[in-house]
């Protein structure tokens, strides 16, 4: 049997996102988290405050270098879930309320702006990466959060389960 270990390592090194790219995503994620925390603390101090959990390819250690487009750039992203954990569903706001507040918190974060999509708010960056910010509500003690999706309100969605499964936890 052929030993292709060296070829696999070389291929993996080519496709996986560089440390500098991962560091940029992490720095931008932390900056956005701080902005959202401050926004809720200053504007909605009596409401449930956001908590965060990264998800998607970054959390599964499968973030790849993007395929370049005609401008020589390639889009890549990070997904960062925003969780609102309350003692009952009576504390839950509307799907649109969560989208509006998150959008207001981040809309001027970059010169590229932000967009409110059905499943999340997206913040765009000049180097063609973006950060998706889906919102979730969960009653404390419940097993699964519900996603604030505008087309399918309060759908069951737990990306943490997928990440844990993928990472063998």
PLM region descriptions:
Residues 1-76, 84-97, 123:
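N-terminal regions immediately upstream of nucleotidyltransferase
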Residues 5-8, 12, 136, 144, ...:
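Intrinsically disordered, low-complexity regions
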Residues 36-39, 43, 96-155:
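Conserved catalytic core of two-metal-ion nucleotidyltransferases
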Residues 79:
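Glycine- and aspartate-rich repeat motifs characteristic of hemolysin/RTX-like Ca2+-binding segments
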Residues 82-88, 102, 106:
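Generic hydrophobic/packing signal
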Residues 161-169:
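Long, charge-rich alpha-helical interaction segments
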């Amino acid at each position: 049997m052929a030993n292709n270990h060296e070829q696999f390592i070389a291929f993996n090194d080519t496709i996986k996102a560089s440390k500098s790219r991962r560091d940029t995503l992490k720095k931008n994620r932390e900056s956005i988290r701080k902005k959202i925390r401050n926004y809720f603390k200053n504007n909605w101090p009596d409401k449930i405050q956001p908590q965060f959990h990264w998800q998607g390819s970054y959390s599964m250690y499968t973030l790849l270098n993007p395929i370049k487009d005609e401008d020589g750039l390639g889009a890549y992203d990070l997904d960062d879930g925003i969780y609102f954990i309350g003692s009952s569903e009576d504390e839950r706001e509307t799907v649109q309320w969560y989208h509006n507040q998150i959008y207001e918190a981040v809309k001027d974060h970059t010169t590229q702006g932000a967009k409110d999509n059905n499943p999340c708010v997206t913040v765009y960056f000049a180097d063609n990466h973006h950060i998706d910010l889906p919102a979730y509500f969960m009653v404390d003690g419940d097993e699964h959060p519900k996603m604030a999706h505008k087309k399918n309100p309060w759908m069951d969605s737990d990306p943490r389960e997928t990440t844990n499964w993928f990472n063998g936890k």
